[in-house]
């Protein structure tokens, strides 16, 4: 999986592990990277809260998906958390779309939030649904 870092100071193993485990379809291990009350915010869906719920959601919704992160940079950093902005692509059996991930880590290096946004316009996405 190619991973190009824009911010050369950014080298966070947890972020890399998130994408690696996701691409291996090891969703329990992916969810284990989250804090106990971690949140996954998929596009167009309600928030998924907690490791078990995240693992179940990924098993149901993400099987067959592959993510290709290409750029990562630190966006916010303070004593209580750090955020990374990642851009790349998501490939499904039906299409490939540009995406971004906002990933927040706590001081224990656990993921507290992954917010995923698709960087395509809604009419393009609806066209896939109609085919």
What are these regions (language model features)?
Residues 18, 30-31, 38, 50, ...:
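Hydrophobic pocket/interface hotspot
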Residues 39-48, 61-64:
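A short gly/proline-enriched turn/hairpin at secondary-structure junctions
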């Amino acid at each position: 999986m190619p991973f190009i870092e824009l911010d050369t100071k950014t080298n966070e193993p947890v972020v890399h592990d998130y994408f690696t485990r996701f691409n291996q379809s090891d969703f329990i291990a992916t969810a284990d990277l989250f804090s106990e009350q971690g949140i996954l915010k998929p596009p167009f869906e309600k928030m998924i809260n907690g490791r078990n719920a995240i693992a179940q959601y990924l098993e149901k919704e993400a099987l067959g998906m592959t993510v290709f992160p290409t750029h990562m940079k630190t966006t916010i950093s303070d004593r209580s958390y750090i955020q990374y902005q990642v851009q790349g692509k998501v490939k499904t059996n039906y299409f490939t779309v540009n995406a971004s991930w906002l990933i927040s880590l706590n001081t224990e290096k656990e993921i507290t939030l992954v917010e995923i946004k698709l960087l395509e316009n809604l009419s393009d996405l609806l066209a896939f649904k109609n085919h």
